[in-house]
Each structure stands twice: as C-alpha cells, then as structure tokens.
C-alpha cells in the first residue's frame, strides 16, 4: 500500500518523528546524519519494479489509490523537513536526502546558501540494472556500471556529496538464472536450489562485480553495503542460491569482497 504521501496527517507525523530524533540525537558523537525518508518510489521506480504486482497488498480495498510519490511532493517534504530538524543538529551532522531512484534530477535542488551539510543518497543494484536491459554477464555489468553508476555519481558529485547508501554483490549471473530483478520464492518464483558454478567461478564473478562497483562509488563520497548479516539460510532453504551475496560477512569470509580499503 503506497498512499502515505496522500495523507497530510501521516506526512506531519513523519515530520514530528524526524524532529524528535533530531532533538534526541542531534548532538550525539555517534550520529553521522539523519536520512529524511528511505526510497521514496517516484514514477520511474514505480513502473520499473511494478510495485503493486511485486508487493501485492494484503488488503486490496485499503490499497486502492496507491500511487508513486511525485517529484513535487518529495521536494517540498525535503525542504520542510530540513527546516524543522536542522536547528537541532550540531554543525558536524548531515541531513541525507534519497534520490527516489532518479539520481540526476536534483541538480537544481537546495542550491541556496542556507542548505548546508546535505548529502544525496542513491541506492544502486545490479538487479535493477538487469531490469533496465543490462546484459547478465560480467562484461555487461561492467559496461552498465561505467556508463550509468559511475558516470552519474561523478556528475552529481559536483552538486552534493553523493553516497551509495545501499548496494551489494547480488546478480542473476551468479545465481545461474534470470531473477527478474531480484525476485524470489516470496514473489512466487522457484529460484535456484542447486549451484550453477564452482566456488572458484562464483568467486571470480563476485570479485569482478565488487571491483567495478567500488570504483564507481569512489567517484562519490562513500558507500554502505546493504547488510552485514542476512538471516535467511541460503544453503538449506530451497530457492535461495545466490542470495548469500547480500550478506557482507559471508562475502568477506568467502573472499568475494576485497578488503584493500
């Protein structure tokens, strides 16, 4: 159900939550920053992911009227939220805005002098690149990463400090089948229960996509891996071959993720 932005009371509630977080933690040494909202689905992401089909509502009646968030709404939300929490934050804290999966549309946003310590967060996944037509080969991934991830981050770094706040090594090639953009048994797909590649072959694939993606993130101001630990047992649960690549701990243990820096 995606109707939050249509309800002023719910929008105001989120603003008050952000205010309370800023008041409570705004001067804590351990706080780096506050992200105003996670992954607002703008029109492009809504259509690409086919949200209503990918995540079918439990209550269809309640979900009627669900729609993507508009650029106009999210821009106003960010401006209002900034004004409401900035005064509670010490000067070394950051306010983070998510790009809504439209990284390059923010060039004219928050250009005024008053907006300080604003970071632009982008979430980039190879599974979404596959949905955009990226060839499911190491060479295809590298081409897409260079032409899109790297190019766009370098371009937007001129306007904001850019972080890749979510990414991982997951890709359909290593899974051995087209995951249709990272869909699983939870979406009604069978998944894979038998490995397609040897451990050494998988290691080569993952090391390659790790290297190319880290080179792209280096064009910005930093990155955060999606998850340190994945609770799903991908070994003993049917249909989950390849999903251990969402788990940074496993990626390091298996030698897939380089620890050079």
Regions found by a protein language model. Give the residues of each.
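Aromatic-rich peripheral "rim/lid" segments of glycoside hydrolase catalytic domains that contact
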Residues: 186-261
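Short, solvent-exposed turn/loop segments enriched in Gly/Ser/Thr/Pro and often Arg
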Residues: 37-40, 101, 226-232
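Alpha-helix termination/capping residues and helix-transition junctions
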Residues: 28, 89, 217-220
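Extracellular glycoside hydrolase catalytic/binding regions
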Residues: 16, 23, 30, 41-211
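Intrinsically disordered, low-complexity regulatory segments enriched
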Residues: 9, 51, 172, 251-253, ...
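An active-site-proximal structural segment forming one wall of the substrate-binding cleft
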Residues: 1-36, 82-84
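A residue-identity detector for tryptophan
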Residues: 4, 32, 46, 106, ...
